[in-house]
Amino acid sequence: MNHLRAEGPASVLAIGTANPENILIQDEFPDYYFRVTKSEHMTQLKEKFRKICDKSMIRKRNCFLNEEHLKQNPRLVEHEMQTLDARQDMLVVEVPKLGKDACAKAIKEWGQPKSKITHLIFTSASTTDMPGADYHCAKLLGLSPSVKRVMMYQLGCYGGGTVLRIAKDIAENNKGARVLAVCCDIMACLFRGPSDSDLELLVGQAIFGDGAAAVIVGAEPDESVGERPIFELVSTGQTILPNSEGTIGGHIREAGLIFDLHKDVPMLISNNIEKCLIEAFTPIGISDWNSIFWITHPGGKAILDKVEEKLHLKSDKFVDSRHVLSEHGNMSSSTVLFVMDELRKRSLEEGKSTTGDGFEWGVLFGFGPGLTVERVVVRSVPIKY
C-alpha cells in the first residue's frame, strides 16, 4: 500500500489572506463602541475600556460589522438580547465568502488549476450550519463536487495549527493530494454592548478582528509545473495544558457567542511552552530556542511578552506576530497563518537566506480553548534570488 502514499513531508505551497474592507482604528474605537451601543453614559466603564485598548498594542483591525448593519439589526448592541438568529443569518453567508477570498489568493499564488485540489478543510468558530461553510466555500470557488471536505466548527484560536496538522496527514497519506485548508472568523458573533458585570467582554471587544487565511498543502511538489514549497511541515502535536480547564472558552447562547478569558492564560502558556518545545525538538537535537524561527499565534500582547521573558528569547523572535497583532488584532484561527505569511514575505524583502528569517528550523504555535496548544515543527526552504 506504500505506493498510495507520498514520499517525503508535506509542504505549504501557497498562502492567501483576506479581510473585510471596513477598518477600525484602535485609538478611535472606545468612542465608536460606546456611541454605537448607546452606552456613552457609562463613563467609568468607557475609561476602563480605553485603557484596555491602549495596552493592547493593536493599531487597527478589520471588521465586517459596520454601523449600517447595526442600524438594520439594532438589537445586536444590547448586552443580553436574543440575537442569535440575526447573527447567524449574516455569518452563514459572510464566513464562506471571506474564506473564498483568501482561497482565491492562495490558488493564484499556487498557479495550478483548481481542478487539482483534492481536499478542502474549513474551520470557523463564528457560525454553524448544515451544509457547512466548507460546502458553500467549495461552491463559491467552483471546486469539483467530488472534493473531499472536512468542516471543523468551534476550535477557536488554535485552529490554524489544527488545519495544518490534518492537511499534513492527508497530503502524506494520499499520493498526489493537494489540500486547501481555510480558517475564517468574523466577530459579529460576539459583538454586543458593554456591562459593568462583564469585563471579559470588554477584552474581546478590544482585541478581536475579522480575517480569513488559506494554505495549499501537498507533498512531492512538482517543480516542472511551477510548484514551490514555502515551508515543510515536519511534525505536529497537540496537548491540553495542566490545570487550565475553564481558562479560555466560548459558549453559543441566545445572545451569540459568549467569550471566556482568564487572566492566568499568559502565565499558563509561558510556564508550559518549553515542555512542548523539548518534546518537539529533542529528536532533531535542538535546545536553543533563539536558533529557530517562531510562527506564534498572538493571542494578546501579554502572552507574547510572558513567553519571550520565560524563554529568554531575543526581541525579534515575535516581530511577525506583533506586526500581525498590531495591524489586524486577534483573528482567531487564521491569525497564525497571517503570521506565517508575514514571515516569508519579510524574509524575502530583507534578503534572508531562507523563508524562515534565515533559520532552517522553526515552530508554529496555536493556543486556544481547553487550554489547548497546537504545535507544528516547520522547516524553511532556501530563497533563490
Swiss-Prot record:
Record PROSITE patterns: CHALCONE_SYNTH
Keyword Cytoplasm: yes
Gene3D superfamilies assigned to the protein according to its UniProt record, in alphabetical order: 3.40.47.10
GO function terms (MF aspect): acyltransferase activity, transferring groups other than amino-acyl groups
Lineage of the species this protein comes from: Eukaryota, Viridiplantae, Streptophyta, Embryophyta, Tracheophyta
Gene Ontology BP annotations: polyketide biosynthetic process
Pfam families: Chal_sti_synt_C (PF02797), Chal_sti_synt_N (PF00195)
GO cellular component: cytoplasm
Annotated source species: Cannabis sativa
Gene: PKSF3
Localisation: Cytoplasm
Superkingdom assignment: Eukaryota
The protein's name in its UniProt record: Polyketide synthase 3
